[in-house]
Amino acid sequence: MSQSPKVGFVSLGCPKALVDSEQIITQLRAEGYEISGTYDGADLVVVNTCGFIDEAVQESLDAIGEALTENGKVIVTGCLGAKSSASGSNLIEEVHPKVLAVTGPHAVGEVMQAVHSHLPKPHDPFVDLVPAAGIKLTPRHYAYLKISEGCNHRCTFCIIPSMRGDLVSRPVAEVMLEAENLFKSGVKELLVISQDTSAYGVDVKYRTGFWNGKPIKTRMTDLVAALGELAAQYGAWVRLHYVYPYPSVDEVIPLMADGPFKGHVLPYLDVPFQHAHPEVLKRMKRPANAEKVLERVQKWREICPDLTIRSTFIAGFPGETEEQFETLLDFIREAELDRVGCFAYSPVEGASANELDGALPDDVREERRARFMEVAEEVSAQRIQRKVGKTLKVLIDEVSAEGGIGRTAADAPEIDGVVYVEPATKASKRYKVGDFVSVKITGADGHDLWGEV
């Protein structure tokens, strides 16, 4: 029997790009290709790129160059594949003319066509043995579930719509089938992602789909309720990411707080507010009523006291005054957000914000980012200290002789804090990766927790 052709894979960028990689790898495996963990063991290499900020562009170009040097046969996909150079030609083809093919993001079909052209697929009578949940690059106990592609917003600092297009929602039955297959495969935590989770279904006017004979609207609240019901059957978690602050978010909070989905639809919201001063928000083309946002945050916490809010912000946006920046700091103190990230504004090629007046020097942007993080970390440390002495449910990610590392409902993988768990002293309390365990929290710093089973 001839040996199956082997494809190497390099995946860069955000969780949405990771899901694209998973879909491509799943299709490769379904068609009988093997996935190689090394360049020299592969017949060709696929590189999934990121093109959002300058550092990501350079990282992607470097990865392509390395793959060309080490292997020589490279197909490129992802956001950078849609990016043009200053001359108007494709940036990747201009920098690396020896690549075999270039596609944009969310292009499984195009990638597979390119693979077929340069590495014909094998005949394999056992291709149906690929698991229904697909091939995942995450650990077995958690997975990302992408519910839509693209974005209808035109934030001035962002070029995602130009690379990924307008919003296209996946059919609700398709989403639910993938979720069920993931839970059946042993996934304990499902992380719902998209460019704009709140807008799910807008493009199809919230049309009604059917799952197991039941009608479900293609709408965030209805999908979350259905996922919560499914997660409850498997004793699993559902976590929401990239939730644009639409009014519809208010409808999801009660699902987290009480009823049959409590403990399954996690009391966790990843909401990118970006700023708090109305003038800056207008220049960003973001919702500009900071006072109402603060009221909503307070209302959310009244309904769901355990709610964890993660957000991201931009400091040093063009035209931002010191007074406007101080308004942002005041908002952080008042809103008491649990997890916060901040970027010093960085011009992105193709973004309309580049045309705005009032660009700030690099040192001012970076100084404001540092000041922001100092305040945000102080707020976060105060909130996390309140967990000391409590017993929390923890999902174990790693186990070693020194103990375990896990996460609470307040901690998404990779971006939030962790819980360092002491080794179990009794056989009945031993745990393994993917287990839920009750942990008594004994200590905390500004980011992480320590505890014992």
Swiss-Prot record:
Protein name: Ribosomal protein uS12 methylthiotransferase RimO
Domain of life the protein comes from: Bacteria
Reactions catalysed, as given in the entry: L-aspartate(89)-[ribosomal protein uS12]-hydrogen + (sulfur carrier)-SH + AH2 + 2 S-adenosyl-L-methionine = 3-methylsulfanyl-L-aspartate(89)-[ribosomal protein uS12]-hydrogen + (sulfur carrier)-H + 5'-deoxyadenosine + L-methionine + A + S-adenosyl-L-homocysteine + 2 H(+)
Subcellular compartments: Cytoplasm
Family listed: Belongs to the methylthiotransferase family. RimO subfamily.
Pfam families associated with the record: Radical_SAM, TRAM_2, UPF0004
NCBIfam families recorded: 30S ribosomal protein S12 methylthiotransferase RimO (TIGR01125), MiaB/RimO family radical SAM methylthiotransferase (TIGR00089)
CDD domains hit by this protein: Radical_SAM
Record's function text: Catalyzes the methylthiolation of an aspartic acid residue of ribosomal protein uS12.
Entry note: cofactor: Binds 2 [4Fe-4S] clusters. One cluster is coordinated with 3 cysteines and an exchangeable S-adenosyl-L-methionine.
Domain MTTase N-terminal: 5-120
GO terms under cellular component: cytosol
Enzyme nomenclature, EC number: 2.8.4.4
Residue span(s) of domain TRAM: 385-453
UniProt: [4Fe-4S] cluster 1 binding residues: C14, C50, C79
Signal peptide: none
Gene Ontology molecular function: any one: 4 iron, 4 sulfur cluster binding
Segments forming domain Radical SAM core: 137-382
Cofactor(s) annotated in UniProt: [4Fe-4S] cluster
GO biological process: tRNA modification
Gene3D superfamilies noted in UniProt: Methylthiotransferase, N-terminal domain (3.40.50.12160), Nucleic acid-binding proteins (2.40.50.140), tm_1862 like domain (3.80.30.20)
InterPro entries: Elp3/MiaA/NifB-like_rSAM, Methylthiotransferase, Methylthiotransferase_CS, Methylthiotransferase_N, Methylthiotransferase_N_sf, NA-bd_OB-fold, Ribosomal_uS12_MeSTrfase_RimO, rSAM
Main localization, broad class: cytoplasm
Residues the record lists as binding [4Fe-4S] cluster 2: C151, C155, C158
Keywords: 4Fe-4S, Cytoplasm, Iron, Iron-sulfur, Metal-binding, S-adenosyl-L-methionine, Transferase
